[in-house]
A protein has these predicted regions:
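Beta-strand-rich solenoid/repeat architectures in extracellular/passenger domains
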Residues: 53-59, 73-84, 100-111, 123-155, ...
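Structural signal for repeat-unit boundaries in curved repeat scaffolds
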Residues: 69, 92, 97, 116-119, ...
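Sequence/structural signature of small/polar-enriched beta-strand/turn repeats
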Residues: 64, 116-119, 124, 252, ...
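Mature, well-folded catalytic/scaffold domains that follow N-terminal targeting or propeptide regions
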Residues: 251, 276, 301, 326, ...
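Extracellular beta-strand-rich solenoid/capping regions of secreted or surface-exposed proteins
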Residues: 20, 35-49, 55-97, 107-118, ...
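Acidic Gly/Asp/Thr-rich repetitive segments characteristic of extracellular carbohydrate-active
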Residues: 2-29
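Short beta->alpha connector loops
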Residues: 13-14, 32-35, 54
Length: 414
């Protein structure tokens, strides 16, 4: 950014007056906590930064709108949980580069390319959404028989024209807490099918805790802790744990493309039909170095339903619940390795599969028709502990299947 004029403010009237007067690009330095703040718009080229412990507490559902080439840093921003604490102006074609650094919000962060907004770059480093509610945010991308809830953090290109491009570099994003998950999705990055594109160099997350608030048994709606839809990301890295708490709440979900996706902390779901990692997209290498564990009827561990993944590596996969399949693959893939076993603890039950409720046994390792792999290697055993549930089902094909540590079906009649 260009050199900015400095201006320090410590009251609502000083802040609103300065923004209304405009003038040359200015870095507004905020001191203290300002309450009952009306809606604010940051002029092009301006920055808003906080001195230690600075905060903006907005009135009602008001928030901060960014225009072009803005930077917001070292601030806490509070609004209604279902409102946008930070949003982008959709009345201009290009937002330039928007920078969000070291921020905490109550309320959503929603950078949405719609209206006139067609291009720009978003850079985020250290953003924590403490509380937000995206359950009613619209529109929602749809496919595979379901629609996807937006997230506490949302980057979404809604343009119909594929020439529209939003680029991004997103690091140190986090949302919610174990005792206070955000509602709706967690981290949501999306383009539009056949239309506006999102291309991100990095999507790095810390701890994410989300609860979609979807009624159990719903067949046409899902959410995710980290969800990439019709967008391309060179590197996804989940440095912190990702935990979902509700029905149909996928922990990690991909409908787009990623060169490399790495998860280095536990992936956990605690609701029915909530999958640990599900892919309908394309990944070069998927590496999960911490446990995947699900607790809920139909909460499968890992699925490939469309697209392909070349290299797949998991630490371990454990499920607890009827119909909670451990690994289920129905498309071509390269090599799958699980280093410390696949274990299921459940029988036959109902689960959501591509927009329909189906009955499935909690098989530990299932290669469906359409699965065609180079190799499957599992150390630490494959076990299904449910009554009448087989440990392994191979209806597809794999050139090399190697399981060490035993294959065990614990229930009678398995």
């Amino acid at each position: 950014m260009a050199t900015l004029t400095d201006a320090r403010v410590s009251s609502v009237s000083e802040l609103t007056g300065l923004l209304e007067r405009g003038g040359p690009p200015t870095e507004v330095q905020l001191a203290g906590t300002l309450e009952a703040v009306p809606a604010l718009t940051l002029p092009p080229g301006w920055a808003l930064t906080g001195l230690p412990e600075a905060a903006l507490v907005f009135a009602g559902g008001a928030g901060l709108t960014l225009t072009a080439d803005n930077r917001v840093a070292r601030l806490r921003l509070e609004t209604a949980p279902d409102a946008a604490a930070i949003a982008a102006d959709t009345g201009r074609a290009d937002c330039g580069t928007l920078e969000l650094d070291d921020l905490t919000t109550v309320g959503r962060v929603a950078i949405v390319a719609e209206g006139a907004l067609r291009s720009g770059h978003l850079r985020v480093n250290a953003l924590h959404v403490e509380a937000a509610d995206a359950r009613e945010s619209a529109p929602r991308p749809a496919g595979y028989g379901v629609e996807v809830l937006q997230g506490a953090f949302t980057l979404y290109n809604l343009q119909d024209d594929p020439a529209s491009l939003i680029t991004a570099d997103l690091t140190r994003l986090s949302a919610g807490a174990p005792d206070a998950p955000v509602r709706g999705g967690g981290i949501f990055v999306s383009g539009t099918d056949g239309g506006g594109r999102v291309e991100a160099a990095r999507l790095h997350t810390g701890a994410v805790h989300s609860d979609g608030g979807i009624a159990p048994g719903t067949a046409d709606r899902i959410s995710g802790g980290v969800f990439v839809v019709r967008a391309s990301v060179r590197e996804v890295f989940n440095a912190g744990p990702v935990t979902t708490y509700g029905a149909n709440d996928m922990v990690l979900d991909l409908w787009g493309a990623a060169d490399v996706w790495t998860a280095a902390a536990p992936l956990t779901s605690r609701g029915p039909s909530a999958i640990g990692f599900v892919s309908f997209g394309t990944i070069g290498r998927l590496r999960v170095t911490a446990p995947v564990e699900t607790f809920g009827t139909g909460a499968r561990g890992f699925n490939i339903y469309d697209g392909t993944i070349d290299i797949i590596e998991f630490d371990r996969i454990t499920t607890h619940g009827d119909a909670a399949v451990g690994v289920q693959i129905g498309r071509p893939f390269g090599a799958l390795t699980v280093f410390n076993g696949v274990h299921t603890h459940g029988g036959t039950g109902e689960t959501l599969v591509k927009g329909a409720i189906e009955r499935l046994p909690a098989i530990a390792l299932s290669l469906l028709p359409g699965a065609d792999g180079g190799s499957v290697r599992v150390n630490g055993g494959v076990a299904a502990h449910g009554e009448g549930v087989p440990a392994v089902q191979v209806s597809g094909s794999v050139k090399d299947l190697d399981i060490t540590g035993g294959v065990r079906a614990g229930g009678a009649g398995s």
